[in-house]
Amino acid sequence: MNLLPSNPHGNGLLYAGFNQDHGCFACGMENGFRVYNTDPLKEKEKQEFLEGGVGYVEMLFRCNYLALVGGGKKPKYPPNKVMIWDDLKKKTVIEIEFSTEVKAVKLRRDRIVVVLDSMIKVFTFTHNPHQLHVFETCYNPKGLCVLCPNSNNSLLAFPGAHTGHVQIVDLASTEKPPVDIPAHEGILSCIALNLQGTRIATASEKGTLIRIFDTSSGHLIQELRRGSQAANIYCINFNEDASLICVSSDHGTVHIFAAEDPKRNKQSSLASASFLPKYFSSKWSFSKFQVPSGSPCVCAFGTEPNSVIAICADGSYYKFQFNPKGECTRDVYAQFLEMTDDKL
């Protein structure tokens, strides 16, 4: 969740995002960065800089390396540089400079992937990074890109050259032709891979439909309806076994869908009437909850079964529990920016 150029809540939060397995989340601040354990909520790291904002933070699971990009009113680093921070040494150990602003960074144990506004560059994760690949994209100001963290699957997915298309490449064998998925008619707003790299979920700027595709064939597996009104989708995430997805939007809601068992999702009683528009056969979320503040948020599934975490731009943390019927209750509320260190 990128809150640049300015967070309306005035709390210094510039960026919030989960690590690869959603076990932690990192925050870029006007004066440094912080790392939290997601569930249960604990502040694990707080790095303050006397002068300097961090507009983007990418973790690599729970290891000591993080990718940082400067941002905010007084950026700590130039916005056209990727800095790899070693949290054991408390300093940057790798620096990669570009001719244009860095939009996003993705990490694997063996790769650094840097997203620019119309191309993606892939480097070795070594002390002197070596450029391996360059992929052209359509104009991509949000820096959309997902990298499979699974050691047996090196998939990289990003917006293709055509509007609404997703391109999937295998970094382990780039001679193979990429999988091109015409996911939406409009501009993409969000993409997400499951942990295994077998499924990709997509949304367009219209934000009414979420589509799930098989990454190897590009075939559509499910089409899910978030709502009938347009919405800005902030986040899509799968749970660990990819049986569920959660979706957050600017309507202040988090929706939960069954990704593998479509019968769990709600459907109109008129769904089987062939003369009615496709809308009536839509599969809707089986559970949803309202973020009380209505603040922009990112969401992921918690460590407990049937739990979802929402991390909000106003500094609030919510944990919700839901049951198979879709009934939802708020379990935990906290202000994560006001917490103190817990290194245990």
Swiss-Prot record:
Predominant place of localization: other
Keywords, comma-separated and alphabetical: Autophagy, Lipid-binding, Lysosome, Repeat, WD repeat
Stored InterPro entries: PROPPIN, WD40/YVTN_repeat-like_dom_sf, WD40_repeat_dom_sf, WD40_rpt
UniProt-recorded Gene Ontology molecular function terms: phosphatidylinositol-3,5-bisphosphate binding; phosphatidylinositol-3-phosphate binding
GO biological process: autophagosome assembly; cellular response to starvation
WD repeats: 183-223, 228-267
Subcellular location per the Swiss-Prot or TrEMBL entry: Preautophagosomal structure; Lysosome
Motif L/FRRG motif per UniProt: ranges: 224-227
Pfam families, alphabetized: PROPPIN
GO CC annotation terms, alphabetical: lysosome; phagophore assembly site
Domain remark from Swiss-Prot or TrEMBL: The L/FRRG motif is required for recruitment to PtdIns3P.
Function: Component of the autophagy machinery that controls the major intracellular degradation process by which cytoplasmic materials are packaged into autophagosomes and delivered to lysosomes for degradation. Binds phosphatidylinositol 3-phosphate (PtdIns3P), and other phosphoinositides including PtdIns(3,5)P2, forming on membranes of the endoplasmic reticulum upon activation of the upstream ULK1 and PI3 kinases and is recruited at phagophore assembly sites where it regulates the elongation of nascent phagophores downstream of WIPI2.
PANTHER family tied to this protein: WD-REPEAT PROTEIN INTERACTING WITH PHOSPHOINOSIDES WIPI -RELATED (PTHR11227)
Family from the record: Belongs to the WD repeat PROPPIN family.
Official protein name in the record: WD repeat domain phosphoinositide-interacting protein 3
